[in-house]
Structures are given as C-alpha cells and as structure tokens.
C-alpha cells in the first residue's frame, strides 16, 4: 500500500518535524585568535553552502599550508533541494564559527528543514572512518505497543537498510530510507546515511555501531537519532522526511483493522415484516466507525494543540518566575539607586551598577514615564532570556513591582563603544585590529537575531551606545527595548509611529514607517562608517561652503576614489588598507537607498570572512545630502554638539507576509 494513506497524514500533522541537532567542538587542539588558521577556517566554511548544494549534497576541500591548513566537509541528506541544502550548511557553518571559538576541530549536525552535517579539522579526515565523537537524542514518548514485537520489526528494518546502503549493487549507496509496519496504523520510519567518501566496508561498520547504540540510548522509546562523524541513523513513528512519501509498503501481517466481510449476495434475515440485508448492515456500520474514528482523531488534534499551547505558556511562566528579582534586593544592590552607582543614561531610563548574589550586574531602571505595559515588559523578558550568543548582552533577570520595571543584565566592564570611539583622548585604545574585531562581532550578533535564533528579531536601535565592550573589547549588542519579533512567514512590517535614533534610521522607515531586517542592515552600515572614521554619524565634515553628514561624506570620497580619507587619523598609519577599504565598501552597500539592494547579514558575514567574494558597486545611499549651505551651518553645529536623540514613541504595527 502507498504511504499516502489517511492516518500517516494526520499523524504527520499532529507530530510535525522534531527539531534535532548536535554539535561537538574538539578538546585537544586550539588555535590563536585572529591567526591564519582562523582566517582559513572562515574562508573554507563560507564556501561550503554553495559548493555542497551545487555538487549533489556532498563536498570536501582544504585550504592553507602546514599548521594553518584546514580541512572541511559538508553533507546534506540525500534528495534535499539545493536551496534548502545550502541554507542548512550555512547554518551549520555559522554555528561552528560561533561556538567553536578557538578549537581546531568541530562537528555540527543541525536540522534546518533537513538534516545536514559540517565538519572541519586541522588534519585530513577525508575517506577515513571516525566513530567518535558520537551522540544521540531520543524521542520523549515511550512505545505503547508490544515492545518485543517492536524490537523485532525494528531490528529487521535496520538490517535490511544497512544491507541496502552498503551493497555494491545498490542504486543508492551510502543512503537508505525505509519503513516497516507494526500494525495497520503504526509504521516505523527510518533513515540512514554515510559520508560518500567512505569505503562501503567503513560505512557498514559506522552504521552497525549506530544501530548497536539502540539498547544504550533509546530502548523503549518511539524514536531516536544517533550522530557520528561519518554517519547518521534516525527512526520515528512519524514520517520526518519527504523521502517516505515515495515508498510503498506491503500490508502488515497482523489482523486487519476490520473483519473481512463475507460474500453476501441476496442473504437476508427476517423478523416479522422487516427484512434487513447483511450488506446494508455492513454498509451502515463501516462508514459509522470511520466517521467516529475521524471525529476522535480531530478531537485528539485539538487537545494536542491546546496542551502544546499550555505547555509553551507554562514554560514561559517558569522562565519568567525564575528570572524575577525582589525590588528590595535591587534597591540593596544599587545602594537605593544611588547617583554614584549610575553608569549610563538612555531614552528609557538609567543604568546602575550593582552587586546581586556576589556578582556584578548592570541594572536598567526604566523610566516611570515609559508606556510599556507590564504584559509587554514580561513578554520582552521571556524573549530576551531565550537569546544566547556571545555577542549579545545576557539578561539575568527583572523586577516588576508597582510602577517599577527593572532589567538586570550581565555587567560589561568597558562601557559602550561610543565611550571610546567618539572621545579623542580614548580613540587610540581602539586600533584597527580591535575595530575590525568589533565589526565582525556585531555582524555575528545581528546574524543570530535575524537568522539563527528561534525567532526573527529586528533590533531597530543599533548604534554605538548600544554596543557594549567586555574586558577584551569584544562587542555585545544591548538594549532590546525597541526590538520587534517577526513570525516565520513575516518579512516586514509597518508602524504608524517612529522609534529609533536619528542618523541610524533608514529612509523607508522614517518616511513610510516600514521596517524589516534590512532596517538593521542600514543602521549597521552607519555604525561601520562610525567605527572606521571615529566620528559620530551626525554632520561631521564642514568646509567654507558645505556641510556633509557621515553617509554623504563617505559616498563622495568613494566616488572620488579616495575612501581612505575617511579613516580615523589615530589608526590611519597602522591599519590594513585593503580591509578598511573593503569595510567601507560593505558599509556603503548597507546604506543604499533601496532596501532590496542592501545585503542580508549572512551575505555581509560572508563578505567579511571571504576576501574572494566579489562586492557589487554601491548605489547612492539613503538620505543623500549633496550640499548644505553655509547659512544653515550654525543650526547644524548646535545639533552636532547635542546628544543623539532616541525617539521612544509607542508603535502600532501591521505585519506583512513574505
């Protein structure tokens, strides 16, 4: 029978794709940050998405010489669409770059619509079997049918698949997707795959080891997945891959769900004057049973959805409760919000340094004039608490009592980027190497918000004062007070009131209230120009007849083939001119007038780590002011001396589908 029957379709809707992933960073070898090995690793991993998808789902290569040589491999599950494969490989590569900070080996098996694998090392592993590291994840649900019978069917299915995967005569070596029936309405779905650079013998060994892990990891569970560096094996009681829709399955040996109907021609039963055909009886009973079954299935679906919703809500409540601090504890930590504890002020309130449970923290006390309600405040806390990335400031907790709304963040000792960048006496502490590292770190942080986190998050207020610096001058993006969350099918939104900081906001946002991930890209471009020139984005270049803002000034220098005139004099003597020029080029691509012309953060990241990536010519930026007369300059001077204004209006947002 074909697997496109009614029950698997309902089961697929009920269960959906389970999100599984695993990763491992090596523990024996390490490289020096910003070394040639790190550069080679970034270049090679950035090349994998396009190469793997273009070569049928598998690609391996190496780059560099001697101890700086990096070997890498990427593989997608057989049959994956090229664009889906590319997205998964890109996600895996970025995952390794963000988590394996200085390890010379790394392995990631993420699932992003499909299952894929990326692996890198400082020694060649191509064509070699590596059984370790291995890890597994099992389904949380137990088997409810006969376990002995399940094991027998499962073992026969695994044996058959290994034979198919490693047979020299097989049409699809190194891969198998197959099914086996437990009952009329319960089917085991399984998939296994080796890296195709292995010998068939090594593939057989790898898969046998993975099958052998069943007793250890997943006995009695409805499903599981075993990852190894050279192969993967997964099974479930639901169709977790599109590959299963193309597989035919013979009817199970068990008794059918309904008894076989006897052959009835004109047989009838008489009672009084009523004559009832047995065929009519069956014609009534069978449809009734089917209808009842479907109704029960639909009710089960509704209960499942409500339970999932309840579980999600409960999880959020648990997270919120575990993060909540008592107001008295906050008062004590800040010496009753003493002026001497203030380390910053912003549009939403003041930031205090404090000590909670023996740990230094930054405590942000929102202004009582803030219109953000308690419910929205809690939602923001739950969302930010789930963000975990080395280039994002970590939220430790909150306090919500009466009119008090307080956020508790990790303490970042070196204050914010603007503290160093715009102070002539401190600019020298940021040499080009540090500035380039800050640009790279901000890129990774925004990429996580836009693409790699569970939700797509638009920051909407990227600026130098919202980039904090840790003890090693690594950047951490802060202040999510204006952030907006996009759903899976949302690519943009409109707002009737503007929130953000002048100079960093793109034209489509200021004029029409439209914002998207490309709004953050525009702000990022302005920020990069500030980092390079060491001056604020407000009007910085003045002559006897003209005043230009930063974007206009950078564009004019670019058009005049003199972009390096933009560079901060404190670093101009000791900077990599090619890197600086490339960063200016990328920044100008980010501030282009048309949002669709601006690159995505994943593309920007690739532009930064892969110098062979050809950059397109930038178009005229948004807010291009060619000449501002001398008569207007006095007013601009006063604006230049003032602090940048952040507009904190309440927003009314309409979302647009992709």
From Swiss-Prot:
UniProt binding sites for ATP: 343-351, 364
Pfam family, one: Stress-antifung
Membrane topology, from the record: Single-pass membrane protein
Domain spans labelled Protein kinase: 337-614
Protein known as: Cysteine-rich receptor-like protein kinase 14
Gene for this chain: CRK14
Modified residues (Phosphothreonine): 501
Sequence ranges assigned to domain Gnk2-homologous in this UniProt record: 23-125, 131-240
Membrane topology (Cytoplasmic): 299-658
EC number(s) per entry: 2.7.11.-
Positions of modified residues (Phosphotyrosine): 409, 509
TM helices/strands, residue ranges: 278-298
Originating species: Arabidopsis thaliana (Mouse-ear cress)
Segment forming the signal sequence: 1-22
Stretches assigned to the Extracellular side: 23-277
Location within or outside the cell: Membrane
